[in-house]
């Protein structure tokens, strides 16, 4: 079903609209006409019907009518992670969340996933570790095609601190089946005032290069200057940086 994103979206819209338009407590409507119109294979119908029954129940309970968006937000990353759908360029600002501020369950998952990719820096540096590096590595692993490029805003510690050493190596997981990154020189933004974020930032660049990792260069392009405001437009910032 995820092979055709437009058809999948139409299916979810139909389910959400039918769940919301039926009378509370009424029988769950049939989806047969939707299945026929969208040519949904027989082997997928039981799972979809089960999901639809859940959507109807949630509507009857007066809970938020967000479930169509919820289903799409779960499914679209799965679609994007398929090799044929991976992107040429990733640009973004991964979430910055220190290990010490994670819940116990999040800490366990973070450590497990970090250890599997060679990103775990050890218990003595655990409280300094940050979700941003794992998020960046995982995003490249799932969504960036081999040869595709990225530019990501990370805490400045990503370019020169010990707890990011595994991230800067460019190899995440086994050399034969893991993800490899070829880094280019990062931007060091710590000397810009005021900071854009509560902590100093950097921008890291590179490309996916499976089997041919290149560690992040130690030399960085250093930006300095004082901005008129943290969110200044580039036309203003360009004159003072």
Predicted regions: what they are:
Residues 1-86:
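Coupling/switch/interface segments within P-loop NTPase motor domains and analogous charged loops
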Residues 69, 76-241:
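Signature of N6-adenine DNA methyltransferases within the class I
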